[in-house]
Amino acid sequence: MTQTLSQLENSGAFIERHIGPDAAQQQEMLNTVGAESLNALIGQIVPKDIQLATPPQVGEAATEYAALAELKAIAGRNKRFTSYIGMGYTAVQLPPVILRNMLENPGWYTAYTPYQPEVSQGRLEALLNFQQVTLDLTGLDMASASLLDEATAAAEAMAMAKRISKLKNANRFFVASDVHPQTLDVVRTRAETFGFDVIVDDAEKVLDHQDVFGVLLQQVGTTGEVHDYSALISELKSRKVIVSVAADFMALVLLTAPGKQGADIVFGSAQRFGVPMGYGGPHAAFFAAKDEFKRSMPGRIIGVSKDAAGNTALRMAMQTREQHIRREKANSNICTSQVLLANIASLYAVYHGPVGLKRIANRIHRLTDILAAGLQQKGLKLRHAHYFDTLCVEVADKAAVLARAEVAEINLRSDIHNAVGITLDETTTRENVLQLFSVLLGDDHGLNIDTLDKDVAHDSRSIQESMLRDDAILTHPVFNRYHSETEMMRYMHSLERKDLALNQAMIPLGSCTMKLNAAAEMIPITWPEFAELHPFCPAEQAEGYHQMINQLSDWLVKLTGYDAVCMQPNSGAQGEYAGLLAIRHYHESRNDGHRDICLIPASAHGTNPASAQMAGMQVVVVACDKNGNIDLADLRAKAEQAGDNLSCIMVTYPSTHGVYEETIREVCEIVHQFGGQVYLDGANMNAQVGITSPGFIGADVSHLNLHKTFCIPHGGGGPGMGPIGVKSHLAPFVPGHSVVQIEGMLTRQGAVSAAPFGSASILPISWMYIRMMGAEGLKQASQVAILNANYIASRLKDAYPVLYTGRDGRVAHECILDIRPLKEETGISELDIAKRLIDYGFHAPTMSFPVAGTLMVEPTESESKMELDRFINAMLAIRAEIDRVKAGEWPLEDNPLVNAPHTQNELVAEWNHGYSREVAVFPAGVANKYWPTVKRLDDVYGDRNLFCSCVPMSEYQ
């Protein structure tokens, strides 16, 4: 044999699993595009002055099995103490049927945000169920389909309160002193850029303060007290103050809905509906408001509409509120939310139903009552008489109690003066309560659970009678039908079948990087060593997490060319906000706080201007030239005009037009010349890794979409992670945290997310990807992503003009197909092509971004030549169909394109079209058929007849 043992061990085996085209297929595609090799192609496309001489040294590739073993050893350094810390995070029991059929199912986790509703009806239905849960529990009229976390939701509530307040001269926001500290932290961060004054005081003192536009109360305080705020809310409403209430999903099963008490906005975390703590996330936040305020709400809202056949169909409603349309005037910069986690919570409610949820909530409360009764019998004092699941226990020798807790591998909340906090949850057992008695009282306490249970069962006054819920919840049939595992499994499968995800076809969305989310990368997220840690546990119990995070941070530093990385932002938009705050605070530290102008190219993603506005900056748009590049003359003029007020520029590279701009370093130099900073949006990092880097180019800060470039799945619209990389001068200004000191970060800035490391439990996905690819594999992934895009552009350019190209007519990792000439000639639009692609078994490319009337295609490196050819052939077949319309063979008002997509119901109904059923549903080359369950959505009907809760079951049948 001629192969060495090292070659036979094949440590780079995963590279060939991740990258779609093999070496022979790559050569075929290189021949098509007219390049000798990958290196030659990159040399033609990427400006030479920004090409790295060698790839960043992040180590050699490891096999899937070796990487898993290495990460398992790291995870083993975490200590899984039983957590009673609470503070918005509790242990859960995720039903195995949901774990296996959703969280571990690529049919759910590889889907994209449901901008194309015809291929998204399953997860849209699950999200509508989530909204119904929120409406029932909060007592309000309108709910969103999730926000990033509870603290972010609080900040959004404050911003919304200001938007809807009639007290236009008021500029103060009141926060009750017993909200969770991380919530207050994030609220203060947001308030600072908005110029709001935050007042923190006891809730009963709110009326003593003047010029208050909004109030934030917490129904169950951070130390456990259940508040009846009905009278206070009534008084605040009489003064036209907007009232927001933070609430707990599980507590709301038993407690009066804040909406019934008059609250305008109610929000909180849905984490305890089946989502593991995961050292802080990801978790979905819920958010609800009165109907009159619906157009001021942040985040995605799912609405009921109709399709072209008049059948009920679901869609994202009121999108004109959002960043991708309204840009800096949007209600929020939110793009990624937490769809996968919201759907877990939604299905948790479906599986347990109202009876099951009440049983769980009552069991938690009963055990808390038993714990309270036993402690009080033995002379310990509780701070609060009214509680749901949390006790604040005064202890004489706190150090001794905490020492016994550590020996018992128990975490209590320890930051309360002369007291400890104890939060119970659905995993708590009677044995756990006995162990808590021993920790707080000593082993000879002599207490008996059954005896205490009899006492409290007949005399529990721990929840005020006025605060006990007296209305039914979750009465819709969907919450009262699927309680056996068989029924639940089939329901989830029926939803999954309605959607198109990466397990069925490529999703060629430009600017979205829908690459492989490998099974080996996903496995660690459900390991209990990662899933079960509380984000505020002692640092010595999370040594495995810290090692993994530090190693990942070090790799990202090398890959980006920056000096430090902050892992806190839990979405790309959140990363933008955090990066801009770092720039803002850097300027302030130099007495340049007046620098508030942010230059943004006209082609920018909508989150850029929305994030700049959130960071307290003024947006000034920079023109692009006829080739789609930043107009340097206009940039220089705008920078000069801004002068000493220039804060920064936000630029994407390669550009959103799909080209490597030759002048990117000159762009950086111009901005630096006028005292500004360069924010390089990391959305297109998949075309940089191993080839160039933001730091090498000359940028100062970037966010990284780990859910794009580094393989965290999109989850149907979240979770995501958006850590920021910064140069050393910005490192002191990245987000900090009020509860946990972030190791290695000297920052004193406020937090942007509830948890110190954001959605920490999905970071192992990116760790695994980098570890298995190694330096050379990562570079090759970028090269093949660029090759695949150029192959598509080369094959399609005669049928659909490629709008922008760089040197030698090349594109970067994505290309924009210009549909406008075809529309002018034939009347067929980019929308018609997008919907017709569904009949061919594909998700549409990105429509009308960054240029109206176009389709932006990004194939990623994970798609094989066979799949690329299938897409190309579909696009060419569609072009032939357009030509038949142009030739008059099919009328413009009745052809397979304008009627697309076609459903099975339509196929078996009376056929009145001038083309055959076969042409409609089995067009040329379609073998792996995907069947949409609805026809094209009627967007106008949906927004004019807004309905955002569950419809009768008959509508689904």
UniProtKB/Swiss-Prot annotation:
Chloroplast in keyword set: no
Entry keyword set: Oxidoreductase, Pyridoxal phosphate
Cellular component terms per the entry's GO annotation: cytosol; glycine cleavage complex
Modified residues (N6-(pyridoxal phosphate)lysine): K708
Superkingdom field: Bacteria
Catalytic activity, reaction form: N(6)-[(R)-lipoyl]-L-lysyl-[glycine-cleavage complex H protein] + glycine + H(+) = N(6)-[(R)-S(8)-aminomethyldihydrolipoyl]-L-lysyl-[glycine-cleavage complex H protein] + CO2
Residues of the signal peptide: none
E.C. number(s) listed in UniProt: 1.4.4.2
EC top class named in words: oxidoreductase
GO biological process, one term: glycine decarboxylation via glycine cleavage system
Gene3D superfamilies: Aspartate Aminotransferase, domain 1 (3.90.1150.10), Type I PLP-dependent aspartate aminotransferase-like (Major domain) (3.40.640.10)
GO MF term set: glycine binding; glycine dehydrogenase (decarboxylating) activity; pyridoxal phosphate binding
HAMAP family attached to this UniProt entry: GcvP (MF_00711)
Task of the protein: The glycine cleavage system catalyzes the degradation of glycine. The P protein binds the alpha-amino group of glycine through its pyridoxal phosphate cofactor; CO(2) is released and the remaining methylamine moiety is then transferred to the lipoamide cofactor of the H protein.
Family assignment from sequence similarity: Belongs to the GcvP family.
Subunit: The glycine cleavage system is composed of four proteins: P, T, L and H.
The protein's name in its UniProt record: Glycine dehydrogenase (decarboxylating)
Species for this entry: Citrobacter koseri (strain ATCC BAA-895 / CDC 4225-83 / SGSC4696)
